[in-house]
Structures are given as structure tokens and as C-alpha cells.
Amino acid sequence: MDETGRLIRDAAGFLLQRDLGGSYRLVLLRVPVDLVEKRVRVRGYHAGDNVVEADGVAPA
């Protein structure tokens, strides 16, 4: 999975609001607090319904 969108933080963790519409709940090993509310690129794999195990999060 390789997607771009806006990184959002909520009470349950992090979400990616996709540029193409919809959102994914992200499972992250590192907490990218410097990228919250910014446009990012997420790489990883689908772990279930709308859940992504993120290998990396970087500015888009």
C-alpha cells in the first residue's frame, strides 16, 4: 500500500484521510507527532478492514 493524504490524530491513535477519499486507521511503530495535520505519504500493508500496518510515514 502506498497512499497520500492528511495525517490525523484522535483518541484512538492515527488516521490517514486519503487524497482519494475515505480513511485508514494506522498502526505505527513510531509516533510521527511532527507530521500531524500535514499531508503525508504512508507505505505499509493492509492488516484488515480500513487498518494499515505502516512501514513508514513521510512528508508528501
Short names for language-model regions:
Residues 1-10:
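Structural detector for short beta-strands of small beta-barrel domains
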Residues 5, 37-53:
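Flexible glycine-rich surface loops and low-complexity tracts that mediate binding to linear polymers
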Residues 10-16:
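Short aromatic-glycine-enriched beta-strand elements
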Residues 54-60:
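Short, compositionally biased
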Residues 18-20, 46, 58:
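A mature extracytoplasmic/lumenal domain signature
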Residues 21-33:
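Beta-strand/loop nucleic-acid-binding surfaces
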